[in-house]
Every structure is written in structure tokens, then in C-alpha cells.
């Protein structure tokens, strides 16, 4: 009887076996993990933790994505040009979790924002140019970047509006992660510039230093990325200091936390500022100068004071140049920028070491203008500058550089006048929305909007000589677009409060 019951349990009552099955599975997994190298084991544990935390809070997955997204170029170099890097994989997983959460809660909604229509127009016009292009698959990859930016913006807005009472916390969290991403790259860049002791020979500057490039593998996009964090950090820092000044007469029990917050933002600004300088990128420097000028101008709520403040700043900077306070190596590099912006036919121009980079850039601008001339309205196809380049290349410049080194000419060549107009409309909407928030937001949240205005300006100016929708920079832009919409919610709430007070 006992033997029969034992056999029945083993054969028929399988539920009794389940705990033992899990134990055996755990033992096998443990044995496999023991055989892994320590570095691989730690990486696996970290990845598992990120996956679990993302399932609980998608915002955590997005935050980690911001940190690892700049690794894309380095991963592609090591792994040989993969389609999806770790940042892209985590982003796709985070978006999938966000959508799945909405479906499970039966609240799959598209948040209303002022950028929904501009994003839709950009997506439609760029997609329209792909059929018949030389390489639709390449154009589709560029198109997916814009789709990702739109989805990231919507996710940030949705997560921020999910619990309105925690909206400010979402804004602070996103700003912190954006600054932390900048710090992580700045530290690498500082090490590359003067602490490592070697580097690519063509990156040598000042005889013994090397241009910083982070994990971007190129100094110019690295400098552009530094601007995203630096200009945002400057705006946030001014916001915190202005809020303190307005409330200095009040007694606060949290000055310690406030000082810690200011210290953290100041550290981020200093490190990313050094990273920007060490990139030795003229385009990034001029983008920073333009972004800083806009931040100074809009810092006071009344623009006449902003104009006076900006004028004073320019005068002081001019005095610094006159007194040679600014290093001559920096001023000399900036002064040569005007040469890079001139137009002209470079066919037949003598090429030498002194003018090589300038002529190369102008040759690619000329090729872009040729594409635009032959395809006025819809261009050669979104993302198809490089595939179409051979037909328009000048004799001495057969190799495409991937883009025209002027994103506006690049876009004109790829999507024509219509596409460039839509792109301009998109950014006009971004600037307009940001300017609106500067009118109504209270400090220190106004500082975030101030930083974003600087970011948009620096980004736009830098793209006069480069293309910055590379190496997952657009992921950070998507989060910033989401921040802008959440700031608009804060501004609307503040406006209603003022109106109620007036009533």
C-alpha cells in the first residue's frame, strides 16, 4: 500500500515535483554562473536588475538608457557595425514595457502635446521621400530615429502625467539623469585629453594633448553632446540661484539639501564645460556661445534687462580678448570659423594642408546643393545623401563623409524645400513652446526651460557645420522634448493659480 501511494505520487501528483524542479533549475543556473568570469557575472546581474526595475518603473529603464546610449559608436567599432547597440535594445524594451503597461491598465492613450502635429508632419514628409530613393533601407533607419524621439517624448509625458502630484519629481529625475549622462562622458573626455598620455595621432592639439571624444569616437559629436548637458545645467543652476535669491529672507530648514543640489549641478557644469573645451570642436564652441547668449538674454523676465545683461557680457568678453585673457589657441581656432562658413565653387582650387579641411567641407556643401538643384521639392530621399553622393561628387573628393557637414544643406538635398520647411516648422514650434514657458514658469522650474532654450540654440548653431542626429543623441533630445511638455503642464498650473489669486 505504501509502495503504491509512493508510486502514485511520483507518477500522477506532479504538483509535488514542482518545488524540486525549481531547486534543480536554480542549482543548474548557479553552476553555470560560477563558471562565468567575474566581469560577465557582474554584467549579467546588473542587466537582470535593470530589466526587473524597468518592469516595475519604465522611467528607470529610460534613465539607464540615457547613460549607456553614448556607448553605441564604441560598441559598433568593437562588434563590427551592429544594427542595435545596448542603448537601443534597452530603449526598445522600455518602450515595450510602457506600451504593455498601458494595455494591461486599459489606458493606451497618446498624450496631447504641442509637438504631436510637428512630429507627425516630419515623419510623413520624410517617409514620403523614401520610395524611389537610392537606398530606402538607409533612409528608413534615419526615419526610425524620429519615430523613436516622438515615442520617447510621449512616454515621458505619459509617465509624468500618470501621477500629477509627482510630476515635479519626474522632471527633476529626468534632468538629473541627463546631467549624469553628460558627466559620465565628460570624465572619459577629460581622461582622453590629458591624463591618458596617448591617442589618435590626428587628434593631437597644442603639441601634447589629444582632442576629447568620449565613446563617440569623434570630437565634434562629442562636443555637441557636451553642450546638451552643459547648457541644460547652466539653466538649472541659474534657476536654483534665482529661486534662492527671491526667497533669501525666508527661513529654511533644508539649506543643506539645497547646497547639495547646487553643488551637484555646478559639478556637472564644470565637468561638461571641460569636456566641451577639450573636444576642441569649433562648431560645439560656437553652439555653446550662442546657447549661453540666449540663456543670458532670457534670464531676466523682462527682456530689456536681458539685452543689457547680454551687452555687458559681450563687452566683458571683448575686454578679455583685448587683454589676452582668453588663450590665443582658442581665439585663433574660433577666428578661423568664418572661413568654414563661406560658400563658393571649389573646383580647381589648389589644395594644401592649410585649406584641406575647409575645401573638403565646401566640396560636400557643393555636392548637397547639386542634389537640391536636381531634386528641388522632395530631394534624393531622407538619409540618402551618402548613397547619392557619387553622382554629385567633385573630382578631388570622391569619398562621402556620411553627411554634408551642414545639416540644413544635408536636409535640403535629402527632402527638398518642402521637407526643410517642415523641419523648420518643427523647431519653430519647439522654440515657441519653450518661450511660452519662460513667461509663466516659477523659479526654479523656469531654469529648466532656460536651459532647454539654450540647448535648442546651441544644437541649431552647431548643425551649421555638422550633423548631430548620431550615436543616440536623439534619445536625449526625445527626453528633453518630453520635459518641455511637462514644464508646460507646470506653467499652466502656475498660470491658473495666478489667475485665481487675481480673482
Where are the regions that the model predicts?
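Alpha-helical transmembrane segments of multi-pass inner-membrane proteins
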Residues: 1-6, 13-32, 46-53, 95-98, ...
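Membrane-interface helix caps and helix-loop-helix hairpins in membrane proteins
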Residues: 34-36, 78-81, 131-141, 274-279, ...
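Membrane-interface micro-motifs in multi-pass membrane enzymes
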Residues: 36-40, 81-90, 141-142, 214-229, ...
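N-terminal hydrophobic segments of proteins, predominantly signal-anchor/transmembrane helices
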Residues: 52-147, 447
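Flexible juxtamembrane loops connecting transmembrane helices in multi-pass membrane enzymes
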Residues: 208-212, 288, 322-366, 390
Amino acid at each position: 500500500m505504501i509502495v503504491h501511494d509512493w508510486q502514485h505520487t511520483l507518477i500522477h501528483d506532479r504538483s509535488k515535483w514542482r518545488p524540486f524542479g525549481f531547486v534543480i533549475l536554480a542549482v543548474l543556473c548557479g553552476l553555470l554562473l560560477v563558471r562565468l568570469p567575474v566581469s560577465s557575472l557582474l554584467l549579467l546581474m546588473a542587466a537582470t536588475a535593470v530589466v526587473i526595475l524597468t518592469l516595475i518603473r519604465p522611467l528607470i529603464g529610460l534613465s539607464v538608457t540615457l547613460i549607456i546610449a553614448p556607448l553605441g559608436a564604441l560598441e559598433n567599432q568593437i562588434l563590427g557595425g551592429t544594427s542595435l547597440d545596448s542603448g537601443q535594445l534597452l530603449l526598445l524594451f522600455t518602450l515595450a514595457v510602457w506600451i504593455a503597461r498601458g494595455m494591461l491598465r486599459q489606458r493606451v492613450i497618446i498624450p496631447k502635446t504641442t509637438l504631436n502635429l510637428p512630429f507627425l508632419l516630419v515623419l510623413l514628409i520624410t517617409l514620403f521621400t523614401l520610395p524611389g530613393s537610392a537606398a530606402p533601407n538607409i533612409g528608413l533607419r534615419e526615419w526610425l530615429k524620429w519615430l523613436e524621439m516622438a515615442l520617447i517624448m510621449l512616454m515621458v509625458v505619459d509617465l509624468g502625467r500618470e501621477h500629477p502630484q509627482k510630476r515635479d519629481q519626474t522632471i527633476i529625475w529626468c534632468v538629473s539623469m541627463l546631467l549624469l549622462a553628460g558627466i559620465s562622458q565628460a570624465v572619459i573626455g577629460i581622461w582622453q585629453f590629458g591624463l591618458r598620455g596617448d591617442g589618435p595621432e590626428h587628434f593631437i592639439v597644442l603639441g601634447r594633448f589629444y582632442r576629447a571624444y568620449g565613446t563617440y569616437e569623434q570630437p565634434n559629436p562629442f562636443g555637441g553632446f557636451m553642450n546638451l548637458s552643459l547648457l541644460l545645467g547652466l539653466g538649472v543652476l541659474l534657476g536654483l540661484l534665482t529661486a534662492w535669491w527671491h526667497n533669501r529672507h525666508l527661513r529654511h530648514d533644508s539649506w543643506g539639501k539645497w547646497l547639495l543640489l547646487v553643488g551637484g549641478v555646478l559639478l556637472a557644469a564644470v565637468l561638461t564645460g571641460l569636456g566641451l573645451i577639450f573636444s576642441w570642436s569649433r562648431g560645439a564652441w560656437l553652439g555653446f556661445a550662442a546657447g549661453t547668449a540666449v540663456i543670458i538674454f532670457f534670464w531676466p523676465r523682462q527682456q530689456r534687462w536681458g539685452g543689457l545683461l547680454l551687452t555687458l557680457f559681450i563687452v566683458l568678453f571683448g575686454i578679455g580678448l583685448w587683454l589676452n585673457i582668453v588663450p590665443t589657441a582658442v581665439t585663433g581656432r574660433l577666428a578661423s570659423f568664418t572661413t568654414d562658413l563661406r560658400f563658393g565653387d571649389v573646383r580647381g582650387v589648389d589644395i594644401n594642408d592649410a585649406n584641406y579641411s575647409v575645401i573638403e567641407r565646401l566640396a560636400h556643401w557643393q555636392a548637397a546643393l547639386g542634389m537640391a538643384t536636381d531634386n528641388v521639392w522632395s530631394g534624393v530621399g531622407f538619409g540618402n545623401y551618402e548613397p547619392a553622393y557619387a553622382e554629385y561628387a567633385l573630382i578631388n573628393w570622391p569619398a562621402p563623409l556620411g553627411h554634408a557637414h551642414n545639416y540644413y544643406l544635408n536636409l535640403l538635398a535629402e527632402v527638398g524645400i518642402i521637407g526643410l520647411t517642415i523641419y523648420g516648422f518643427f523647431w519653430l514650434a519647439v522654440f515657441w513652446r519653450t518661450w511660452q514657458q519662460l513667461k509663466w514658469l516659477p523659479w526654479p522650474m523656469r531654469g529648466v526651460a532656460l536651459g532647454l532654450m539654450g540647448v535648442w540654440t546651441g544644437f541649431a548653431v552647431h548643425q551649421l557645420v555638422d550633423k548631430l542626429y548620431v550615436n543616440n543623441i536623439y534619445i536625449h533630445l526625445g527626453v528633453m522634448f518630453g520635459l518641455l511638455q511637462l514644464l508646460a503642464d507646470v506653467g499652466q498650473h502656475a498660470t491658473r493659480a495666478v489667475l485665481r489669486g487675481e480673482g
